[in-house]
Amino acid sequence: MGLLDLFKKKGSSDVAKDRLKLLLVSDRANCSPEVMEMIKNDIIKVISKYMEIDTDGLDIQITSTESDTNNGSVPAIFANIPIKDMRNSEK
């Protein structure tokens, strides 16, 4: 990925791919795409209070992981959130 790719606007195929990923993740986690979108928006809102983030590079996934208490697999949220700048903590 080149430096200029960072500033490229997402095309319709990229948007469709992101929507498909969201649908697959929500299916695995047994929650609707609408709930997944609400979770994503809430995470963005809370984190944005403390730092400036790159919402285009944001990647939130719900996957299954093995439980530490031998209860089988449990859902887990993984978030990759690029930080542009930290906000002043004196607000």
Swiss-Prot record:
Q: Which InterPro entries match?
A: MinE (IPR005527), MinE_sf (IPR036707)
Q: Does the keyword Cell cycle apply?
A: yes
Give the record's keywords alphabetically. Cell cycle, Cell division
GO BP terms: namely: cell division; regulation of division septum assembly
| Cross-referenced Pfam families | MinE
Tell me the SUPFAM superfamilies matching this sequence: Cell division protein MinE topological specificity domain (SSF55229)
Homology family = Belongs to the MinE family.
Function of this protein? Prevents the cell division inhibition by proteins MinC and MinD at internal division sites while permitting inhibition at polar sites. This ensures cell division at the proper site by restricting the formation of a division septum at the midpoint of the long axis of the cell.
In Swiss-Prot or TrEMBL terms, this protein is called: Cell division topological specificity factor
Gene designation: minE
